[in-house]
Amino acid sequence: MVMMKKLLSNRLFNMSKTASQSLMNCRTSSSSSLAMRTRVPKDIGEATIDPEPGDLTISQRFLNKFSMNGIDTTSKMSIGESLMEKLKEMDMNKDRIRLDGLSHPKEETLGLTVQDVKKLLRAAEIEVIKTKLMETGKIWIRYSDFLGVCSDSSLDPSQGALIAKMLDDSGNVIVMGNSVCLRPHQLTKSIEGLLPLSQIHNPNDPRRKELNELEAIKTVIDQKAHSLVRRELWAGLGYLIIQTAGFMRLTFWDLTWDVMEPICFYVSSVYFMAGYTFFLKTSREPSFQGFYQSRFEAKQRKLMQSEDFDVGRYDELKKLFNPKPSGAVPKILGSLQN
């Protein structure tokens, strides 16, 4: 019996020692404070019974494990709920068009590039310069004056020589030495008569024979018209002679000068009005030469109509085989010599 009591007391002592060590090694201060409160009685007279050390340790471990499991479960639940919400949002938004993620299509700009703007400005400058050159009313000007117009009308005066060269290369003007032709079309028409063409000088060309026939017919018509006009002129001269003789008779024999003076004045006024009317109708000087040309053309037209003469065909063939240079040719030759 004594031995059994000693063994029992040793086991209890070892158990209490182990419990105290576990209490000292506990990580939470709350458990240690709780153990101290259970071991220390509130009142001195109150008897307390110490709990079993093993039971306290087991309960503390269970509480710690429960608290950790609760925290893990809560965190797992929160993570799972957030994941489910994300999945639901993705499922709800899978059929929706995300406008914020779409990029706007590139609009096709129809604007002008820098090169296009430069071309338009250069074309506008050239048109302004051409207008100013035409406003001068001249056919030929000096190259220095031409260069001055190009420089003054350009946005950049230093580009005047370049614009002048562009006008010359494009054929808008023709630069010949120190002279510039502002109307190249007139120059080309004038030089056409100076350029020999092999086709024109072909003696077997049937058009040349046709021209010769028309010229023969026209020569006959011109002779007839000339003779008719000459008759009219002789008749006019005879009329003036008779009128002058009649006025002399009335002035010196039948009537007096006082009577014939106003009559001669009014007759002269009638002749003046007739000459003025002739000028208005024909735009020619009221002279004998002008009257002759007017009457000759009138008679010539009548005879051509009566002979069925093709004036258009005759003018075309004459221009082709016998071109006449215009009056600008001497000016051109003079400018080339200078």
From Swiss-Prot:
Biological processes annotated in GO: mitochondrial calcium ion homeostasis
Pfam families recorded: MCU
Binding site for Ca(2+): E261
GO cellular component: mitochondrial inner membrane; mitochondrion
UniProt superkingdom: Eukaryota
Main location: mitochondrion
Motif Selectivity filter per UniProt: ranges: 257-265
Transmembrane segments: 233-253, 263-280
Keyword tags: Calcium, Calcium channel, Calcium transport, Ion channel, Ion transport, Membrane, Metal-binding, Mitochondrion, Mitochondrion inner membrane, Transit peptide, Transmembrane, Transmembrane helix, Transport
Reactions accelerated catalytically: Ca(2+)(in) = Ca(2+)(out)
Record flagged with keyword Transferase: no
Alphabetical list of InterPro entries matching this protein: MCU_C (IPR006769), MCU_fam (IPR039055)
GO molecular function, one term: calcium channel activity
Transit peptide: 1-36
Role this protein plays: Mitochondrial inner membrane calcium uniporter that mediates calcium uptake into mitochondria. Constitutes a pore-forming and calcium-conducting subunit. Mitochondrial calcium homeostasis plays key roles in cellular physiology and regulates cell bioenergetics, cytoplasmic calcium signals and activation of cell death pathways.
Protein's name according to its UniProt entry: Calcium uniporter protein 4, mitochondrial
Source organism per UniProt: Arabidopsis thaliana (Mouse-ear cress)
